Structure formats: structure tokens, C-alpha cells
Amino acid sequence: MAIYVTSDIHGDYKKYIQIFDKINFTDDDTLYVLGDVVDRGTGSIKILLDMMCRFNVIPIIGNHEYMAYYVLSKLVEEITEETLASFNEDFLVGMLSWTNENGGENTLKEFQKLSLENRQAILEYLEEFTPYEEIRVNGTDYILVHSGLSNFKENKPLDSYTIDEMIWARADYNKIYYKNKILITGHTPVSVILNDISADKILKQNNHIAIDCGCGYGKNLGVLCLDTMKEIYI
């Protein structure tokens, strides 16, 4: 039985599906996906449909799932002139931001090809994404969250953070958040953290593990086994 974490797959179905062969994934193992499964790539919905069928793949919400749900939940039914007229300016601005600026166009195209039943199933699955997970592996406590913990206080309960504080703000990787826990995040590519465009490996420092290796930009998809701390790259 092994515990794995990955993040920021960004619609790359080919790399996603290779994870399971590469780590010899079994029903006794667990894979935590720390958000941003969707957008940019062309296989976002295909990945979600596969994840839905795997009881031991645990999804954590990222800002891209948050944006996608906001838009797709309004588009689940057939779009007519009447429904278009009902969309307010805030929704239209949000939809354009997601599709044009954040890579949601491919996800939207995939979603529109689904049957009504599968559209509803995708939305119900997105509603199951948790804002964070706390786990213990080999005596070490881990907090898994998409982007970090904005307005952080060490004694602040995790369930008192807002969703925005967990999916948008970039973590400070030079700061120790917890003395006795390891914070694992995605969201910010390692190349951005290190200001090194060539960086594409998992970063471990200051009781913090950054696992976004840049898959959304054509770089590695990183997977980390918490039992052995072995790093796997696809």
C-alpha cells in the first residue's frame, strides 16, 4: 500500500494515464491529485471521466476546477437565445476569463460534446473535490492543498480558511508554515519558484514540497511517493 501525490495535470491525458503503469498502481494504493486537472490540454474531461471511476484517486480542488465549475454549471443544459439572455455581465466576464486567459476553451469544447447525463455527472464529481486533505504517512503529517494558505496563522484551523485562500494565493516557499507538518502544494510551477525556466523537478525545502513541475507548459508531470519519497517523472 503506497500513497502518491501529483498536481497540475492540465488536460494532458497521455501523461495522466501513464502514471498508473509507471508506479504499478493497485487498488491498495492511493493517489491524491492536488488540483488543476483541467484546462490548457485537450484531455481534461477525459481525465475527469477516468478519475470518477477510481475510488482511490482523491481529488483536491484547484483554481481551474473552480473556474470550470462556475461556467459549466450554467451551460449544462442546451444553450438557447433565452439562456444566453439570462447570463449577467459577471458571468460573461468570468467565462471569457476562463476560456480566453486560463486555457478553458478546450475543456468547454470537450464538455459540450458530452451527453446531458455525462455533463451532470462531471459537475457532480467536481462538487466532490475537497479544499484540502490531511494525511499521516510513516509518522509524518502532511497537509495537501492546491496553492497554499493565504493569511496563514499556524494555529488557524484548516477548515476556517476560505476556498480563495487555498486555490489562488501563491505559497511562500522560503517560509516554514508548520514546524511539525509538511505542506504539499501545486499551482506554482517549480520554474517560477526558482526563477529558472529549466527547473522541472519536485522542490523540497522549509517543510514544504512543491509538486507542480510544469506539465501544463510541456514539462514534467511529477509524482511523489510519500512512503519512500521517490520522485517519478512523466
What does each model-found stretch correspond to?
Residues 26-28, 54-56, 139-140, 179-181:
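A general structural motif
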Residues 44-47, 53-133:
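Active-site neighborhood of divalent metal-dependent phosphoester bond hydrolases
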